[in-house]
């Protein structure tokens, strides 16, 4: 059985007690058991001189099933964050549903941050197609402007974009450049149709990276920078598996420097 140090034990116990008291909760036996299992498992990880895992056995993998009402998210997040900080590793929490991601990012992690002494930053990882490409947006609007000029000469011709689409694109431009929107499709105040979003969504084929004139104001790379400085990264299973399939560290932290939690 893995042995957890007194310091690690006190760190987790103190923060759990602080979290319970701040929220007015009572300790649950099943939650405490789950916290202990995860803490002991991570405490048993042996690192080599380069900070990499020295033991390749499966003893540092836990499969935990807990009933409704356990408080599973806190039961894995609190000890995993504490141990990741202790081991100087990143924590990647992977979920199956958008709802659970939003619960983590908007409720559970802010709650832990505010009601414990754990000093950590977190970010939500998404595929690049969820972000606005400023260059594509500007090019689309330039096309609209040129088409409008042509129509004054040839009024019988139709614009390539519907009026409603033009209004959508102009609104995106105003909101993003005005700082009222971060370029994430999911944080838009209004829905945008798939075809309209596809016109301006970031994609690998058209992205020129640091060579782009809009690189310093790129929504995608701002989000990627946030991931690099985050201690806890929330993602979905598809993104995690795709990143690992590409060798790792394309979007998410390097796998050898990470602790992974797969929630359902």
Language-model features: where?
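A substrate-engagement module of RecA-like helicase motors
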Residues: 2-17, 21, 26, 50-58, ...
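Glycine-rich P-loop/Walker A and Walker A-like loops and their local beta1-loop-alpha1 context
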Residues: 64-76
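N-terminal pre-P-loop "Q-motif" helix
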Residues: 25-51
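Walker A/P-loop NTP-binding motif
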Residues: 39-41, 74-87, 107-111
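SF2 helicase catalytic motif II
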Residues: 255-264
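Conserved RecA-like ASCE ATPase "motif II neighborhood" in helicase/translocase motors
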Residues: 214-224, 237-255
């Amino acid at each position: 059985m893995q042995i957890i140090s007194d310091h690690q034990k006190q760190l987790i116990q103190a923060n759990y007690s602080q979290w319970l008291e701040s929220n007015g909760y009572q300790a649950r036996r099943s939650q405490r058991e789950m916290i202990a299992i995860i803490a002991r498992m991570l405490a048993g990880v042996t690192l080599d001189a380069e900070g990499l895992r020295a033991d390749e056995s499966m003893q540092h993998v836990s499969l935990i099933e807990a009933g409704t009402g356990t408080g599973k998210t806190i039961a894995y997040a609190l000890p995993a964050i504490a141990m990741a900080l202790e081991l100087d590793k990143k924590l990647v929490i992977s979920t199956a549903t958008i709802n659970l991601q939003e619960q983590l990012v908007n409720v559970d992690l802010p709650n832990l941050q505010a009601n414990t002494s754990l000093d950590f930053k977190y970010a939500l990882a998404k595929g690049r197609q969820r972000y606005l490409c400023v260059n594509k947006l500007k090019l689309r609007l330039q096309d609209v402007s040129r088409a409008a000029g042509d129509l004054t000469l040839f009024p019988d011709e139709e614009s390539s974009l519907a009026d409603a689409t033009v209004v959508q694109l102009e609104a995106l431009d105003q909101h993003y450049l005005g700082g009222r929107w971060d370029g994430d499709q999911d944080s838009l105040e209004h829905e945008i149709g798939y075809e309209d979003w596809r016109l301006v969504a970031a994609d690998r084929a058209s992205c020129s990276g640091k060579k782009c004139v809009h690189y310093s104001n790129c929504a995608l790379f701002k989000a990627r920078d946030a991931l690099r400085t985050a201690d806890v990264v929330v993602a979905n299973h598809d993104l995690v598996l795709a990143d690992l399939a590409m060798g790792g560290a394309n979007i998410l932290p390097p796998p050898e420097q990470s602790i992974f939690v797969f929630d359902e």
